[in-house]
């Protein structure tokens, strides 16, 4: 029997694109995927700074273990854009991970 699957979105500022907000979405299947592997793939695809890998993996993992929370906002290790002070509400120096159920268990 197939279990639930989730859609996870990492929302953060992209310094390479005029500091625009960027949503990176991917599917997550418990038992098949892991937060560590997904975060590493984001770094390898140059979508995430390597110094943020462990933070993103940890926050994804926390959200996966409690999907009812729906989202988590956390400070990044990578610095915000030059001259920009960290602002949590605007995700300057912060990132947000969101999760939603896309597939329910099939009996």
Where do the language-model regions lie?
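Intrinsically disordered, low-complexity regulatory tails/linkers
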Residues: 1-107
């Amino acid at each position: 029997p197939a279990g639930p699957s989730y859609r996870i979105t990492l929302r953060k500022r992209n310094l390479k694109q005029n500091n625009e907000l960027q949503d990176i979405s991917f599917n997550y299947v418990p038992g098949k995927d892991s937060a560590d592997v997904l975060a590493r793939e984001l770094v390898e695809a140059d979508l995430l700074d390597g110094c943020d890998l462990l933070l993103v993996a940890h926050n994804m993992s926390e959200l996966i273990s409690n999907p009812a929370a729906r989202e988590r906002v956390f400070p990044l290790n990578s610095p915000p854009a030059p001259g920009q002070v960290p602002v949590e509400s605007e995700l300057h120096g912060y990132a947000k991970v969101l999760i939603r159920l896309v597939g329910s268990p099939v009996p």
